[in-house]
Each structure stands twice: as structure tokens, then as C-alpha cells.
Amino acid sequence: MPDLIARLAFNTRVRSRIWKQLAKLLQNRMHLHEALRLLKFQAEERKSPLVKVYAHILHKLGRGRTLGAALDGLASREETLLISSAQDSSRLAGGLLLASKVLDAKSSIRKSLI
């Protein structure tokens, strides 16, 4: 599991952005492992703590886990369920976009309540 700083950096806003990026890469026919390695490389270039999150996810995927299972403990239950079911039905890009929309909607609702 990534350290506390990496998990804090992997916040709702960042996850929403990452899900959109991953979806776009997958829609352009890039494989999931390739897309995650690319995002990890970009994080390394920026010296971002997200490198540890990407490394964790890639490690779990390398051990045969699904993306949803790899995100367990890093993302909300709703996200992991949406992403897992989308991956199971071979519609991962759509599931990632849906997860991003859910995060954005929840954030918008929270902001309107405050």
C-alpha cells in the first residue's frame, strides 16, 4: 500500500482527472498496463507522490488482480464497483468516465451544501 503522502495526493479531484486520462488512452487503443506505465512515467517526471500509487496498481495488476481490486483502499467503494463491473463487461473506458462523473457530481453537491 502506498504511503500516507501518496494516498493523500490521490484525492477525489486527482482521481477524477486520472479516470478521464485513462479512459481517453483506452479509447485510443492503448492497453491498461501501457496506459498506467505512461501515467507513472509522467508522475516520475513531475516528481509526484502519485508514482507510488501507480506502482502499487501496476503491481496488483501484475499479480492478476482487476483494476477495481487494485484500487481497493485507495478509491471509494462506488468507484471500485463501477470500475470493476465495467472491466468485467469489457467497457472499462466507459466505466472510468462514469466514475469520474460520479466523483465530479459528489464534489459539486458538497460544494453547494457548504
What are these regions (language model features)?
Residues 1-114:
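Catalytic metal-binding core of the metallo-beta-lactamase
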